[in-house]
Amino acid sequence: MHGFDHVYVSKDSGIFKFNKRSEFAGLPISIQSQKLAASASMFDRESINVKIFVAPAHSLDHSTLQALKKVTRIRIISDGLLPFPYKREGFGWLPNQLNEAETKDKGVWTFNYHPETCSDEAFMQLKRFIENHHTEFTPLNKLRYHPYRFEQMLTEKYLIYKRCFYEYIKSIWHGAKIYVPVYHKP
């Protein structure tokens, strides 16, 4: 499930601080529950058993998690910054850090493609990747979730704030007007 209407109504970046826009983060749990229940009912109507939630713009908060538990059977979130699946707040979390398929030395990774913005070449690369690496894919029911302990929490917070710091520096650098004095002798 990828949200309900994909309309960003909040500027809250949620748990992972990826984007300053959200369909869910920052909204009251009652509104989040309504949206998630409406989305779940569409899948139920089509007899589709949804197992994973992918928050639009990677922005979800703790109320989103509570609403998911309350109105859906979903117990897996595709998001997060750790290199392995982990258990947190009653959900299995699958790391989602990649916008295109690439090999990794270790870990379990998901990658996402947005059909409306991907080129034909990007889809051909994905097809080739799947053909070449199909034996490395793991079914959901075979994943092993690691505990979310203090060490994982620190690692995740470090990765979140490291990215926030880089984005802040980038915004200063790109927003700054650089004055370079040039000596000119008439």
Model-derived features: where do they sit?
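Conserved nucleotide-sugar phosphate-binding/catalytic loop shared by glycosyltransferases and other
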Residues: 2
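Terminal accessory/targeting
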Residues: 5-6, 10-52, 57-186
